[in-house]
Amino acid sequence: MSRVCQLTGTRANNGMAVSHSHIRTKKLQQANLQQRRLWWAEGNRWLKLRVSTRALKTIQKKGLGVYAKSLGIDLNKI
């Protein structure tokens, strides 16, 4: 399973690690992904999703159905 948020598509970011002597080396900044079982009220069922913590905060605020609809995602296909 790839490290990608199933709702937002958030993935790893390429960055640089800078030492005290300013030597720069490439590093990969992974997304903070969590495996969660979320209740989808409109579908009256549980969905097991791998989502970022930022997406989890938005789901708590708006609700899973509204948030997925705003992203253009059909939850019936998951």
UniProtKB/Swiss-Prot annotation:
GO biological process annotation, one example: translation
InterPro entries: Ribosomal_bL28 (IPR026569), Ribosomal_bL28/bL31-like_sf (IPR034704), Ribosomal_bL28_bact-type (IPR001383), Ribosomal_bL28_sf (IPR037147)
UniProt superkingdom: Bacteria
GO molecular function: structural constituent of ribosome
Record's GO cellular component terms: ribonucleoprotein complex; ribosome
UniProt KW keywords: Ribonucleoprotein, Ribosomal protein
A Pfam short name: Ribosomal_L28
Similarity section: Belongs to the bacterial ribosomal protein bL28 family.
Name of the protein in its database record: Large ribosomal subunit protein bL28
Species of the source: Prochlorococcus marinus (strain MIT 9313)
Taxonomy of the source species: Bacteria, Bacillati, Cyanobacteriota, Cyanophyceae, Synechococcales
